[in-house]
Amino acid sequence: MDDKNNQEENELSKISEVELIKKITKSFKNTNKSTIIDIGDDAALLKFDKTNVTISQDILVEGVHFDLSYMPLKHLGYKSVIVNISDIISMNVKPSHILVSIAVSNRFKINALEELYEGINLACKNYNIDLIGGDTTS
């Protein structure tokens, strides 16, 4: 019986995202005075001299957050920006820059990725955001 309870307690599907974050980061302690709001909120708040910087990151996973059988890549690109800037906005901050990191399989053609980036570009234009870098792997 104890083994079954231990197995159930160890199942990701049994806890919320917030509970998971608390469990896996409980031994981390901030060492920098610049960290004002850390893990556990929608975004991090850092203070450098008199300047506040808010940082957020979200990941979208196919089959979990979107389904390409009915979501056009342009819409996915737009959504990928919105889900990230919404965390910044929820902290009452105007987003200004984004990094895009993408892991894409070789099943996609270059023009498909161009369509994805059309959506990213449209969201950036609509919200006056600069794309300043990121990481791409395939």
What are the functions of these language-model segments?
Residues 1-72, 91, 100, 118-119, ...:
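Extreme N-terminal cap/leader segments of soluble proteins
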